[in-house]
């Protein structure tokens, strides 16, 4: 979630903004010095408090390091929008098992959202429901133009409820059993599920007039704007390296290759984008959680 962190994932490089001091493991064949020099220069230029870096192949972790204030590669941080990619995989897992169809109307499973009659699960995945960004869960309605991408956390909050309703489990339980365990991810959780982990988390940083200011993350169960499934899963950089490996393996033991291709390549254009939706002036498109 951009109000806490920015998490960016590339094909062979995972960079997650957790704010911690240099700790390096398994450099493999990479030139550590060159990697670290580049990262430190970028941190300084961008006035970023810290960053964690993971470089992986589809078979192993090649390099993992944390730069900044904390000094732990195991530092926990809020995944923000990257949580949505996990939620998308959870929904696709249900579809693979024949529990749902992506073209199904969401009200078939969650009739309480009667204002979304005609909105399909696939539209929620693509965020083309017409729900506006500032919409709260208790006031859900499709006010915008359906079929046009608009980033609204409520879309993925509703998908989290779908997973719970269909599976009969909590979102975290289903994700752990069907996604995280298969990826070997043992340090990914939510504070709703594990409130005792509050003190283990690295602080979030917000930018005030060019200066990073630490802010302790607090899970708010009554938050109607964003929920666990739309932005509040927590992880560390080593687990995120494992998550990236699953994509490099085209789904591995988690979902089939066609679904991974669909998540990444079945996209809708991002138009009328804000600065936070823009990446280096490129043309953006949105898949399912990506």
Question: Where are the predicted features?
Answer:
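Bacterial N-terminal signal peptides that target proteins for export
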Residues: 1-9
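Acidic helix-start/capping segments at beta-turn-to-alpha-helix junctions
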Residues: 56-58, 105-113
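Short, solvent-exposed alpha-helical surface patches in non-cytosolic proteins
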Residues: 80, 85-89, 109, 119-128
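Short, conserved catalytic-motif segment at the N-terminal edge
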Residues: 29-79, 99-101, 133-142
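Short, surface-exposed loop or secondary-structure junction motifs
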Residues: 114-290
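Sec-dependent signal peptide cleavage junction
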Residues: 18-30
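Bacterial N-terminal signal peptides
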Residues: 10-20
């Amino acid at each position: 979630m951009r109000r806490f962190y920015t998490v960016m994932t590339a094909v062979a490089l995972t960079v997650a903004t957790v704010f911690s001091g240099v700790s390096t493991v398994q450099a493999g064949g990479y030139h550590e010095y060159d990697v670290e020099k580049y990262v430190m220069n970028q941190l300084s230029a961008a006035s970023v408090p810290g960053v964690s870096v993971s470089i992986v192949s589809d078979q192993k972790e090649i390099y993992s390091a944390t730069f900044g204030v904390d000094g732990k590669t195991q530092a926990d941080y809020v995944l923000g929008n990257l949580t949505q990619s996990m939620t998308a995989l959870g929904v696709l897992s249900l579809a693979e098992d024949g529990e749902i169809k992506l073209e199904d109307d969401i009200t078939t499973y969650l009739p309480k959202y009667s204002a979304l009659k005609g909105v399909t699960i696939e539209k929620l995945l693509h965020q083309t429901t017409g729900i506006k960004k500032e919409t709260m869960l208790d006031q859900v309605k499709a006010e915008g133009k359906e079929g046009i991408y608009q980033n609204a956390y409520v879309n993925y909050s509703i998908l989290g409820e779908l997973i719970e309703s269909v599976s009969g489990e909590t979102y975290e339980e289903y994700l752990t059993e069907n996604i995280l365990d298969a990826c070997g991810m043992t340090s990914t959780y939510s504070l709703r599920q594990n409130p005792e982990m509050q003190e283990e988390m690295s602080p979030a940083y917000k930018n005030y007039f060019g200066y990073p200011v630490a802010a302790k993350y607090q899970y708010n169960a009554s938050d109607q704007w964003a929920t666990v499934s739309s932005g509040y899963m927590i992880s560390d950089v080593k687990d995120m390296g494992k998550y990236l490996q699953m994509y490099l393996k085209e789904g591995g033991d988690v979902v089939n290759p066609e679904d991974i291709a669909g998540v990444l390549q079945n996209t809708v254009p991002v138009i009328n984008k804000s600065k936070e939706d823009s990446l280096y002036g490129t043309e953006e498109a949105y898949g399912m959680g990506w």
